[in-house]
Amino acid sequence: MISLTKKYTAAGLIAKFNNLILLGRRSLKCENLSGNWSMPCGMIEPDESPEHAARREFFEETNVRASKEVSFLTDFQMKDDEFFALFYMKIDKLIFPSNDAIDAIEHDEWGFFKIAKNSLPSPMTRETRNAILKLK
């Protein structure tokens, strides 16, 4: 459940198909996490909820609309008093991000990966890896 006392400044959304999740490798053009694998994510705009930010970032990076049902997975501290909110949605078919997405340049590769410690790509932040493994 989203905390009402934490200051969320970024959010992300994982698309889950059976035991697979969609991840993208951050391009070298990205200021944050260049070369790392992650879910579509980004900064929360002023007056935007963490869930809305996660949905918006997912669309901007993949050109795919998030399903109606999105669930809170976890959060983790980024720095000092700032937190990252992570959501997930179940999908009934594989989706493929479009090169026409608003922020398509943020990723240089996409893939579906099995939710298992030894199946996730590297490099990836410890916080992202630990959060993904909670989906098992």
Predicted regions and their residues:
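Generic marker of residues within folded, mature protein domains
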Residues: 3-5, 29, 77, 100
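Residue-level signal for short segments within beta-strands and strand-turn junctions
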Residues: 15-17, 25, 90-91, 114
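Conserved N-terminal beta-strand and adjoining loop/helix that marks the start
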Residues: 1-22
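A generic fold-level signal
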Residues: 6-8, 16, 31-32, 79-82, ...
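Unchanged
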Residues: 42-135
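Conserved Nudix-box catalytic region and its N-terminal flanking loop in Nudix hydrolases
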Residues: 17-60
